[in-house]
């Protein structure tokens, strides 16, 4: 018998704004300064999802895709709350915001409200020329995106001790003489790694210099003599 069927349902709304701009701030015979900007802003949300209804909040949702009114691929996680100084176990928040070492993954996960795709991205830079000398730059940026850091998560995996290279941050792990720390115990018998959470959910915003170049253009008269 058929218990489920795939269907193309739901609506993804995208509200975009794109900008491309180049402006000459200075322009004369000897000097030219041009600023350029390229950018995109995207606001998306889901609607008309005929899926599961959260028994607590009543929200319509598809775990892994999103919920009505939220961004696509929104994270749905148990919230990580640090380390229990008494025993080194991981601490979490239940749905009501109470601390617990043993969250229920069926009832204590909450929607993050964060985007896993950029809200804004683009580049900007300037071109400066003065009597043949020039400087050119470009910066790239991404804003409004949070994603799980799988690489760092793997480097902090205590089950890989003595098998693979791991992060030096594990040296800060909880011990009876190091109780105030942000790294849980690595001792067996703890709850570390037992629960999926947003512990390694990381803001991925960045501003990076893509390139910078400096040079000199030989005058045409000089080139004609070569």
Outline where the language-model segments fall.
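Hydrophobic, lipid-facing positions within transmembrane beta-strands of outer-membrane proteins
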Residues: 15-21, 120-126, 133, 209-214
């Amino acid at each position: 018998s058929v218990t489920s069927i795939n269907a193309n349902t739901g609506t993804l709304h995208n509200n975009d704004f794109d900008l491309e701009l180049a402006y000459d701030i200075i322009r004369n015979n000897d000097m030219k300064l041009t600023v350029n900007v390229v950018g995109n802003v995207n606001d998306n949300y889901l609607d008309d999802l005929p899926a599961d209804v959260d028994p607590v909040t009543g929200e319509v949702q598809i775990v892994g895709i999103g919920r009505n009114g939220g961004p696509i691929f929104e994270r749905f996680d148990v919230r990580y709350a640090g380390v229990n100084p008494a025993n080194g176990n991981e601490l979490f928040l239940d749905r009501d915001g109470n601390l617990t070492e043993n969250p229920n993954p069926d009832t204590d996960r909450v929607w993050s409200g964060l985007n896993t795709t950029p809200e804004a991205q683009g580049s900007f830079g300037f071109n400066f020329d003065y009597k043949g000398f020039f400087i050119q730059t470009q910066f790239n940026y991404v804003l409004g995106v949070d994603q799980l850091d799988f690489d760092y998560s793997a480097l902090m995996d205590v089950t890989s001790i003595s098998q693979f290279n791991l992060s030096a941050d594990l040296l800060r792990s909880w011990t009876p003489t190091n109780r105030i720390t942000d790294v849980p115990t690595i001792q067996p018998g703890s709850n570390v790694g037992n629960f999926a959470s947003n512990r390694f959910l990381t803001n991925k915003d960045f501003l990076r210099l893509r390139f910078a170049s400096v040079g000199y253009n030989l005058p045409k008269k000089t080139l004609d003599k070569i």
